[in-house]
């Protein structure tokens, strides 16, 4: 049974900084059981950029992040059996995990034994020989065909995944499963969900931090809680807006293609170029616009849309009020008046969640909206949470990442969580 040695509202320090554990949570953590002397299967996400010419690691960010969890389990005298993936079949960076293990070993300054096997005789023998505090890293789980093929969450259960050969072979040799792979938690693969049928499934520190920050930001962070939603993945962002508003987020600030969707939904003709982009690039765009209309009606005054925009007029920035639309030029950024209004809202917010840029920020002519809004978020005195993927990359490129309370490790996983979707790996931990 879980021990009650550690209170649920303990504070923790990770590679990404301090965080407080949720007082009310639906998952167990590494504190809830005595792990000393126990075999622990730890699933992490160290999928990294690889030089295709020599196989060298180009980025060790994820390895550093998960190293802290590996080290903590080793410090607890657990016998750590690490599972992870790298890329997928057919890709140039679909390689084994030997160099990942070597880099992690350097980071935590202790031996990590790489085993070029996943659940064959060699892997099982190494697991049988493991001692307290030792760490072994098994090979790329995606070398196993079932890890790739068994990916469907059927009939609200994980029977197919829990019956996978990898899971059935490794499970008898472990007492606990720790899932630290938040970035892959929207996937339903054996190594992520299968073990929970055989042993307690616990959240690792990276997973715990993600769930704590994202959960608080959406549902219980300091008020007023606002969300800045932009970028080109408009269908995702409109779904996120719906979930946020249902959870009590007070205001949504829109930019990018997301703003264009809401402008159309509010009855504004945004012009042929921007309309055609939505029709070609946004799947089921008519349904997305209908949902946006519904949200504007249901949550009157809570969704902020641009009052002015910047058009791309032959490569030059041209500002105009939305009343002057349609124009024959595409919308590439929010306008100055909108920018000032959004910044005032951000400055007074208790919690700010950001996902997606305000415009085509890759072009310096149209980067003003994104640069200024992201800068304002970085200066906020409230709780600041940034989605993964291109948003996290933009904050890093702008040198603002260190000023943000939490930047998510997951792109697709973060979007799924913020949209309120069922996430298989999280369901398996309940």
Model-assigned labels for residue ranges:
Residues 1-430:
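Active-site loop-to-helix "anion-binding N-cap" substructures in soluble metabolic enzymes
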């Amino acid at each position: 049974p879980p021990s009650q040695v550690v209170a649920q509202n303990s504070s923790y320090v990770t590679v990404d900084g301090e965080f407080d554990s949720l007082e009310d949570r639906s998952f167990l953590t590494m504190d809830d059981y005595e792990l000393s002397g126990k075999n622990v299967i730890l699933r992490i996400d160290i999928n990294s950029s690889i030089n295709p010419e020599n196989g060298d690691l180009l980025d060790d960010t994820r390895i550093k992040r998960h190293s802290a969890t590996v080290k903590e389990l080793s410090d607890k005298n657990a016998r750590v059996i690490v599972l992870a993936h790298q890329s997928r079949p057919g890709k140039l960076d679909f390689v084994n995990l030997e160099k990942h293990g070597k880099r992690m070993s350097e980071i935590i300054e202790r031996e990590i034994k790489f085993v070029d096997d996943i659940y064959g005789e060699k892997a099982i023998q190494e697991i049988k020989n493991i001692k307290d505090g030792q760490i072994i890293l098994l090979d790329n789980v995606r070398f196993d065909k079932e890890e790739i093929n068994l990916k469907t969450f059927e009939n609200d259960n994980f029977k197919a995944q829990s019956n996978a050969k990898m899971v059935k072979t490794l499970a008898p040799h472990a007492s606990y499963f720790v899932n630290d792979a938040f970035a892959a938690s929207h996937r339903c693969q054996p190594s992520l969900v299968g073990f929970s049928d055989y042993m307690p499934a616990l959240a690792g520190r990276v997973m715990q931090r993600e769930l704590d920050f994202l959960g608080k930001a959406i549902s219980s962070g300091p008020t007023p809680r606002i969300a800045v939603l932009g970028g080109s993945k408009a269908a995702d962002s409109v779904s996120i807006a719906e979930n946020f508003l249902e959870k009590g987020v007070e205001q949504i600030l829109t930019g990018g293609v997301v703003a264009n969707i809401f402008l159309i939904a509010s009855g504004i003709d945004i012009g042929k170029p921007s309309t055609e982009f939505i029709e070609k690039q946004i799947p089921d765009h008519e349904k997305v616009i209908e949902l946006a209309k519904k949200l504007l009606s249901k949550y009157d005054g809570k969704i902020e849309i641009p009052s002015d925009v910047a058009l791309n007029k032959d490569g030059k920035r041209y500002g105009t009020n939305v009343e002057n639309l349609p124009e024959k030029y595409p919308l590439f950024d929010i306008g100055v008046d909108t920018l000032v209004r959004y910044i005032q809202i951000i400055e007074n917010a208790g919690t700010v969640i950001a996902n997606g840029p305000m415009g085509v920020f890759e072009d310096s002519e149209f980067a003003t909206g994104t640069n200024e809004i992201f800068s304002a978020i970085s200066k906020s005195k409230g709780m600041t949470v940034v989605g993964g993927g291109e948003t996290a990359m933009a904050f890093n490129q702008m040198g603002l990442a260190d000023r943000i309370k939490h930047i998510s490790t997951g792109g697709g996983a973060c979007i799924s969580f913020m949209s309120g979707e069922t996430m298989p790996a999280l369901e398996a931990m309940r």
